[in-house]
């Protein structure tokens, strides 16, 4: 199910199980995982978007292997908070994922995360080619970190 309220999402999570975060793009999908205590987010992987079936199968394998209990998906909205074409694409992907997995899904505003991730990697002198391969996973970890920080802030 797709949950719009963070407190409700948190109530549906299984204790001592990690979360997965997804930065969904048309060419690449960034993936991040939390630890079991939901205290830190780590970039995990970047999946090439061959087609939705391959992407969902790859995500399902990660979810099963790491016993993930919930999914955070970055929701791309424009700077004024409006819906874009990519917003609708991500919403459709979230619906497909919901049907395939049955885990709670929370959509998190992802404004500027990919740009921030790219700047972060650039600050370490990482070359453009390597940044472009890793920025989506780092962006996914930033999206997940926003959620984890909100959980801590609200003492959930």
Curated annotation (Swiss-Prot):
GO CC annotations on file: cytosol
Annotated compartments: Cytoplasm
Q: Per its UniProt record, what SMART domains does this chain match?
A: YqgFc
In its UniProt record, which GO terms are filed under biological process?
rRNA 5'-end processing
Q: Which domain of life is it from?
A: Bacteria
Query: Which keywords label this protein?
Result: Cytoplasm, Hydrolase, Nuclease, Ribosome biogenesis
The principal location of this protein is cytoplasm
GO MF annotation: an example: nuclease activity
Q: What is its EC number?
A: 3.1.-.-
What family does the database annotate?
Belongs to the YqgF nuclease family.
Q: What biological function has been recorded for the protein in this entry?
A: Could be a nuclease involved in processing of the 5'-end of pre-16S rRNA.
Q: What protein name does the entry list?
A: Putative pre-16S rRNA nuclease
Natural source organism? Rickettsia prowazekii (strain Madrid E)
């Amino acid at each position: 199910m797709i949950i719009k309220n963070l407190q409700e999402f948190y109530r549906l999570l299984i204790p001592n199980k990690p979360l997965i975060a997804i930065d969904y793009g048309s060419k690449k999908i960034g993936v991040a995982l939390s630890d079991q205590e939901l205290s830190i987010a780590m970039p995990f992987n970047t999946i090439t978007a061959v087609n939705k079936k391959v992407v969902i199968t790859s995500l399902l394998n990660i979810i099963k292997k790491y016993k993930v209990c919930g999914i955070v998906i970055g929701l791309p909205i424009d700077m004024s908070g409006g819906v874009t074409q990519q917003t609708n694409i991500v919403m459709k992907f979230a619906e497909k994922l919901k049907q395939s997995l049955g885990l709670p899904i929370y959509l998190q505003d992802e404004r500027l995360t990919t740009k921030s991730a790219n700047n972060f990697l650039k600050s370490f002198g990482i070359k453009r080619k390597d940044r472009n391969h890793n920025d989506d996973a780092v962006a996914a970890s930033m999206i997940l970190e926003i959620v984890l920080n909100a959980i801590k802030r609200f003492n959930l």
